[in-house]
Structures are given as structure tokens and as C-alpha cells.
Amino acid sequence: MAYDSNYTFPDPETSDKQGLLAIGGVLTPKRVLQAYSQGIFPWYEPGNPVLWWSPNPRLILIPNEFKISRSLKKTLKKPFKLTVDTAFQRVISYCATCSDRSNKTWITSEMIETYTQLHEMGYAHSFEIWDGSELVGGLYGISLGHAFFGESMFHTITDASKVALHFLCRIMQSWNFDFIDCQLPTLHLMSLGAKIISRKEFLHMLQETLKYPDKKGNWSID
């Protein structure tokens, strides 16, 4: 399926050693969806052109392979409230000020605007963790086929982002989703069960999961 029939990205296999595939262009919702459907994602700093990446290797998390440590097991027993798609703009704004990627603010105002539009279109989703009325953790990403493309997480109390990821994995497993794309390998995510695969394997898995219809709309849990 072509999400943006007016634009085609280069073959991901032609990216450089760091995974950089293309530079420039306008960050529109349709173009972002087209990128994800080809195993590509935007990542750039404010004031710079849009950079499009398809790294090799890739990091993914199979929903039923999430690892729960002893400390996290204790945290999961706390009376958090878990919600989906009730505070997308707050989650992405928190993520923008609590960046996971080398402590740099990479979630630009342009990205916030585009991903908010994708949320309104039913493609971008947020998972929220509440301690009473306070939003203490969460994550957001894109859903296509039976895959969830994680973008960023945040927490204001210890392990709240891990609670959000565990919450995401539970929901993805119940919906028979195939994998969560974690993009770049990190020791933190690997300690939670994420694994490294080749770009070739990732692209194959991606094409298989895109055979399923997109689960669009405002998500909810019963």
C-alpha cells in the first residue's frame, strides 16, 4: 500500500553505514507513513533538514518476550492507572523534553505537529501511566499492519516508562501484533527483551505484517 503516491524513498539497502538514507523533504503525515511502510523513520535536530534513516542492524521487541526484572515486578504492583490515547499531546510534549537519544532534543515542533495530525488520523497512539491524576510515564508511536513503531518514552518517577512499555506489550500481544520496532539498538531496551536483527530480516517481517489491515482510530482498553 502506498500511503504517499507522490513520493518514493530510495531502497533502504542504499543507506550509509550509519543508516542515513535521505536528506530533506517536507515532513507530512502521508510521507511519514510511507517512510514507516518502507522501514524508514525521520530523526533530526531542530534547525536541520529532515534526515531519513533505515539502520542496519535494527532493534525489535516481540510482545511476549518482554523481560520483567525484580524491581519492575514490584513497581507493577503499584496502583497505576493505565490509559491509551487519552493524552497524546501531553505524552509527546513530555517526550520532547525528556529525550532518550543521547540527551538531545530531537522531537522538533514540526514533528509534534505532524505526529499529532497522525494521531488525529488514527495512526499515532499514546500509552499513558498515571499516579492518581498525575501523568508520570508514557510512550507514543505509529501503528501499521500488525506492527507498532515506537518513537519515544518518558518518565517522571522511576520505572514509569518501563511500566508503559510493559503495558504496550500486553496490549500488542492480546491483539496478535507481530513486533514493536525499537529502531536503534540500546542496552536499556535489550535488557527488557528487545533483540537485534538484520535490516534484511526486519524488512521481510515488515512486509509480512503490512499484509494485515491497519488498526486505525482512537484506541481504548476495556
From Swiss-Prot:
Keywords assigned by UniProt, alphabetized: Acyltransferase, Cytoplasm, Transferase
Catalytic function, reaction form: N-terminal L-lysyl-[protein] + L-leucyl-tRNA(Leu) = N-terminal L-leucyl-L-lysyl-[protein] + tRNA(Leu) + H(+); N-terminal L-arginyl-[protein] + L-leucyl-tRNA(Leu) = N-terminal L-leucyl-L-arginyl-[protein] + tRNA(Leu) + H(+); L-phenylalanyl-tRNA(Phe) + an N-terminal L-alpha-aminoacyl-[protein] = an N-terminal L-phenylalanyl-L-alpha-aminoacyl-[protein] + tRNA(Phe)
Localization terms from the record: Cytoplasm
Alphabetized GO MF terms: leucyl-tRNA--protein transferase activity
InterPro entries assigned: Acyl_CoA_acyltransferase (IPR016181), Leu/Phe-tRNA_Trfase (IPR004616), Leu/Phe-tRNA_Trfase_C (IPR042203), Leu/Phe-tRNA_Trfase_N (IPR042221)
EC number: 2.3.2.6
One annotated Gene Ontology cellular component of this protein: cytoplasm
A Pfam family per the record: Leu_Phe_trans
Gene3D superfamilies recorded: Leucyl/phenylalanyl-tRNA-protein transferase, C-terminal domain, Leucyl/phenylalanyl-tRNA-protein transferase, N-terminal domain
GO annotation (BP), single: protein catabolic process
PANTHER family, per database record: LEUCYL/PHENYLALANYL-TRNA--PROTEIN TRANSFERASE, LEUCYL_PHENYLALANYL-TRNA--PROTEIN TRANSFERASE
Family, as annotated: Belongs to the L/F-transferase family.
Function: Functions in the N-end rule pathway of protein degradation where it conjugates Leu, Phe and, less efficiently, Met from aminoacyl-tRNAs to the N-termini of proteins containing an N-terminal arginine or lysine.
Protein name: Leucyl/phenylalanyl-tRNA--protein transferase
Source organism of the structure: Legionella pneumophila subsp. pneumophila (strain Philadelphia 1 / ATCC 33152 / DSM 7513)
Taxonomic classification: Bacteria, Pseudomonadati, Pseudomonadota, Gammaproteobacteria, Legionellales
Protein encoded by which gene: aat
